[in-house]
């Protein structure tokens, strides 16, 4: 079983994706578990006029040295990670089974091999999701995190990247995928696929399924698929 500990300001953004299909089943069958830690829960409350008497849990501030936007403060994130580590250590005495990931577009490239290794080596993966202009860099220094990127692009926050990691790593956990899904998982790339109807008519033009796929000749079909991988 793999436990994902997600440090995020927006835990509700995960609900729909984790509550459906393979990941929902994996959680129900206790193949994986996902727990959230909101840095706001570890921040000291202040009051701002815009919210009258409601406490405002601040987790960001202006960057030192100037620049646009706001930066997530270190202490609320540190405390959230500490809580995640405490929960992880209750379940495993081997610290080598715990991994802390700091999501960053400049980090190590996440891929299928990374997902496989993570599923094999770790029982607890703590994923830190940034927002705004980023997180105070001292968080990385304190915990000696591993910077990981899901691609050479910038996202509004780390939540989407975290979902990608959860999905990909979970698929490598034994028992999460069925036979059909396992077949899909072995493909680095996939050929074109077709289903009924055999002839699709769109704007008076006919689009037909390749004849080889209708032939019943499994060897020919396999050769066709190998030649049409994209």
Which sequence ranges carry the predicted segments?
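SAM-dependent methyltransferases
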Residues: 1, 195-230
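N-terminal nucleotide/polyanion-binding subdomain common to many enzyme families
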Residues: 1-85, 221
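Hydrophobic/aromatic beta-strand patches that form the interior of the parallel beta-sheet core
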Residues: 5-7, 35-37, 101, 125-126, ...
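Short His-Asn-centered micro-motif
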Residues: 10, 103-105, 128-131, 151, ...
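S-adenosyl-L-methionine/SAH cofactor-binding core of RNA-modifying enzymes
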Residues: 71-129, 136
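Structured adenosyl-cofactor binding patch, chiefly the S-adenosyl-L-methionine
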Residues: 135, 139-182
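Internal, active-site/partner-interface "lid" segment
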Residues: 160, 172-211
């Amino acid at each position: 079983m793999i436990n994902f500990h997600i440090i995020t300001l927006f835990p509700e953004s995960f609900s729909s994706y984790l509550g459906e299909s393979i990941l929902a089943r994996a959680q129900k069958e206790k193949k994986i578990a996902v727990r959230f830690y909101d840095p706001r829960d570890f921040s000291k409350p202040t009051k701002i006029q815009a919210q009258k008497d409601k406490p405002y849990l601040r987790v960001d501030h202006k960057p030192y040295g100037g620049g646009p936007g706001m930066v997530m403060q270190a202490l609320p994130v540190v405390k959230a990670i500490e809580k995640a580590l405490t929960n992880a250590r209750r379940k495993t005495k081997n610290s080598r089974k715990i991994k802390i990931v700091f999501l960053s577009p400049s980090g190590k490239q996440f891929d299928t091999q990374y997902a496989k290794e993570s599923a094999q080596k770790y029982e607890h993966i703590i994923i830190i999701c940034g927002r705004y202009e980023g997180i105070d860099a001292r968080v990385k220094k304190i915990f000696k995190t591993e910077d990981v990127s899901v691609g050479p692009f910038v996202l509004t926050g780390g939540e989407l990247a975290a979902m990608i990691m959860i999905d990909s790593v979970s698929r490598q956990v034994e028992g999460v995928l069925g036979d059909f899904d396992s077949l899909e998982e072995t493909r680095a790339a996939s050929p074109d696929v077709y289903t009924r109807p055999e002839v699709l008519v769109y704007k008076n033009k006919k689009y037909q399924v390749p004849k080889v796929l209708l032939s019943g000749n499994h060897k020919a079909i396999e050769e066709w698929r190998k030649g049409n991988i994209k």
